[in-house]
Amino acid sequence: MKSYPSDTWCTYPFTALVLHNGGSYGPCCSANEAVAMGTDDKEVVLEMYNPNQKTEFKPYAMSAYQAFNSKFMKDIRQQMMEGKRHTACSSCWRQEDLGIKSKRQGMNQVYIEPGVGHADGGFEYDIDEMVKNPRLRSLDLKFDNKCNLHCLMCTSGSSDMWVPLDNKMHKYLALQNVTKEDDLDLYMDDAHKWQWTPGEFPETLYEEIKRLVPQLQEIQC
């Protein structure tokens, strides 16, 4: 078993971003906080599932490069190096406190220990290199929330099939029905993996992705 920098360390903030279909960025799709460009052109942090969220921001105004190097992401990386629990990752902390294997723990294995429970796939990155030189290697794009599934761990922000369920459970879940945005400002510094969520997409998607990110090695669907 590999030795991690701390008990709260996660590969995602050091290697990945998710671009939400509302135009903000997070370290992963499970994070409950995101970063975006405010209306005053300054970085703002958003609470993803707070129905009383009042912070105004400009969707897609921040590039992936800016997001990955934002104060928000740097704070997450720093707190994890210090063994602290960042509030953006509360979903994983709750699962781990209950004795459930969290996404953080599972993805650490995928990225660092692909031979542990992952016979197919995996990356086996070098931890020291990731810590010393965080680089954007994986960008998870959500083009819209059109989907024919309503997976238990998902939300209406990623699947419109959840909207009717949210309406029934509005006292417990934040309503999120996000419309499609076509103009994406994308920049990946050292990318090799691009993951998209089921939804509408242009017929020339793959050609456009390769044009935007020529160093891409893998497109995962």
Where are the regions a protein language model picked out?
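Accessory C-terminal segments flanking Radical SAM cores
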Residues: 1-117, 135
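A detector of helix-start/N-cap boundary segments at the beginnings of structured domains
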Residues: 5-8, 138-142, 195-196
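N-terminal pre-triad scaffold of radical SAM enzymes
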Residues: 14-22, 128-157, 219-220
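Canonical Radical SAM [4Fe-4S] cluster-binding loop centered on the CxxxCxxC motif
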Residues: 27-32, 133, 141-194
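Short microdomains enriched in Cys/His and/or Lys/Arg
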Residues: 49, 109-127, 168-203
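Short boundary motifs at domain starts and secondary-structure transition points
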Residues: 124-133, 210-212
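Radical SAM/AdoMet-radical enzyme domain recognition
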Residues: 203-221
